[in-house]
């Protein structure tokens, strides 16, 4: 997300990363973006996808909802977020796929995609 504009147009995260940058910097000012706020943004992207699925299992706050949320996360498939693509499974709770990694280099104090 900190290098959103530098990502190639074909990068799966570019659209979401640019949305994060636009929303965040509109609120906090140009140049204020950071990877930590992007993690929070990405969490909301994931929840917007998972919660409607989990609600079919039960009401929020119940054991059924929590189980439904876990099941949704493990089965909802590929989710593009500002810092990569997530695809959790029952056996993989890290979830980040290898397809979206980029190498960054600091040049004159700024991050640059290599």
Each model region followed by its residue ranges:
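Extracytosolic ligand-binding ectodomains
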Residues: 1-114
């Amino acid at each position: 997300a900190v290098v959103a504009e530098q990502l190639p147009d074909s990068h799966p995260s570019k659209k979401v990363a640019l949305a994060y940058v636009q929303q965040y910097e509109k609120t906090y000012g140009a140049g204020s973006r950071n990877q930590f706020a992007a993690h929070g943004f990405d969490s909301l992207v994931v929840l917007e996808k998972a919660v409607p699925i989990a609600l079919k299992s039960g009401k929020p706050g119940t054991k059924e909802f929590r189980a439904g949320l876990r099941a949704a996360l493990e089965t909802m498939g590929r989710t593009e977020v500002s810092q990569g693509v997530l695809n959790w499974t029952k056996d993989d709770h890290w979830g980040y796929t290898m397809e979206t990694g980029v190498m960054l280099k600091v040049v004159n104090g700024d991050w640059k995609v290599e």
